[in-house]
Amino acid sequence: GMGGDGGRGGQGGLGGSAGAGGEGGGGVKCNGSADFCDRRFDEVSYPMTHNAMSNAEDGWNLPNQNFNIVTQLEAGVRGMMLDTYDEDGEIVLCHVLCGLGSRPLVDALTEIRVFLDENPGEVFSIIFESYIENSETAAAVEESGLIDLTYAHTGGEPWPTLRELIEADTRVMVFQEKPGDEAYPWLMYFWEHAWETPFSFATPEDFSCDPNRGDPEAPLFLLNHFLTSPLGGSSDLAEMVNYNPLFLERAEQCQEEGEALPNFVAVDFYDIGDLFDVTQSLNSR
């Protein structure tokens, strides 16, 4: 076993993720594929988890996911929607009712930072639904060390390629759904750069590709692909919509209607169904 570990360690020097160097003469992989390296950030589709923090593995009630943030990262999730609150003076992740589950924001961001340090060929995105001050978000990003990996994009400019982001080691996109602050150029206002589908669907028949928030001319497109019950997340609802052909057909329909690649494909219970097959299909056209 020792020899195998040594072999893996030897590849780290290439600056790619695990397995870099396998292709004809040592090309670096970007988010798992050499094919993505020269695509701009907005030319790739990323598997995303809705309410990523709310998960059964960590004991949350009414969770949106089965597994926690570290497990999600290891499975290949490359975007997370995270809700931030001030709970009695502590900055935490929770979903509406912090009594159902909460966690210090800095702890979760530190886990993300550690994973990205260990996987230098990976680009990752966060979309904050923030109910805290921008300065409080910034403090947690700084304390976790994630600040060193952030990228600040200028609206209207072309997005860099994954290779450029990886070589500069600015591999973390931090977006939020409310305006940012000139003091924190890396804390990007999502709706300056992106648009989305609606997200309040009770049944599969309700699904729509209509523009909701954001400008459909914006370069990034968020596909909300989850059903909501009055109580929140439901693995039974995920079972209904997370499988192909329904899932891929909706993604392709929205790509066609919106004339835009779904960049962030957001689901509940990512481990149920075909999320990774869908993003792979979108990325292989």
Per-segment meaning from a language model:
Residues G1-G27:
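Ser/Thr-rich, Pro/Gly/Ala-heavy low-complexity intrinsically disordered linkers and tails
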Residues G27-R285:
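Catalytic cores of phosphodiester-bond hydrolases, prominently lipid phosphodiesterases
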